[in-house]
Amino acid sequence: MRPLRWQVAVVAAAGLALALETLPAVLRWLWVRRRRPRREVLFFPSQVTCTEALLRSPGATPSGCPCSLPHGESSLSRLLSALLAARVSLELCLFAFSSPQLGRAVQLLHQRGVRVRVVTDCDYMALNGSQIGLLRKAGIQVRHDQDLGYMHHKFAIVDRKVLITGSLNWTTQAIQNNRENVLIVEDEEYVRLFLEEFERIWEEFNPTRFSFFPQKERAR
């Protein structure tokens, strides 16, 4: 009987060790299953608040901001927080992009090593105040259209998991003055569809496909 008891003890110990080894993975799985997917709606115009704490550069020492702006939460700060949650990738498909705060957030993600890709409209990227030139100067990949229609999308995809979309152009005018809406949705199917659209446009706007004399080409 002693050998049998010894074998039972060994099996029990091995089972316990296996259970302890797999417990963290099981707990993570249960947490993911129980966690509610993100569903958030933001309305604009946004209250003007200080966003310096969110946009602090990597390695910067935390310090209180002396500005006179309110330091509470706003629609803009919540949008910034959703963007800055990116750890791996950020796809942006934007008609107009001139907000300095949102531009700083995108550059900050690039500095952190997040892969950022931007698709925008060729006419609006050339306007005064556009952030597109600064993004390109920082080394961020940007592509634009070359046709008569507008690239009028307004969406972002964070880590291929979270979709941010709505009526909002990423401009100070829209953020502070216009009545706009933004949806922040964690939904696999919606993200997949928008990501497919982004990849389709990204490939269509590949600069190697461009004609530098489109008017002459059409005249032929």
From Swiss-Prot:
Residues 1-39 are annotated as: Required for mitochondrial localization. It is found in: Mitochondrion outer membrane; Nucleus membrane; Cell membrane; Golgi apparatus. The chain crosses the membrane at residues 10-32. Residues 33-220 are cytoplasmic. SMART domains: PLDc. It is a single-pass membrane protein. GO terms for molecular function: cardiolipin hydrolase activity; protein homodimerization activity; RNA endonuclease activity, producing 5'-phosphomonoesters; zinc ion binding. It holds the Pfam family PLDc_2. GO terms for biological process: lipid catabolic process; meiotic cell cycle; mitochondrial fusion; P granule organization; piRNA processing; spermatid development. CDD domains: PLDc_vPLD6_like. Its EC number is 3.1.4.-. Its main location: mitochondrion. Presents phospholipase and nuclease activities, depending on the different physiological conditions. Interaction with Mitoguardin (MIGA1 or MIGA2) affects the dimer conformation, facilitating the lipase activity over the nuclease activity. Plays a key role in mitochondrial fusion and fission via its phospholipase activity. In its phospholipase role, it uses the mitochondrial lipid cardiolipin as substrate to generate phosphatidate (PA or 1,2-diacyl-sn-glycero-3-phosphate), a second messenger signaling lipid. This is Mitochondrial cardiolipin hydrolase. The lineage of its organism: Eukaryota, Metazoa, Chordata, Craniata, Vertebrata. The gene is PLD6.
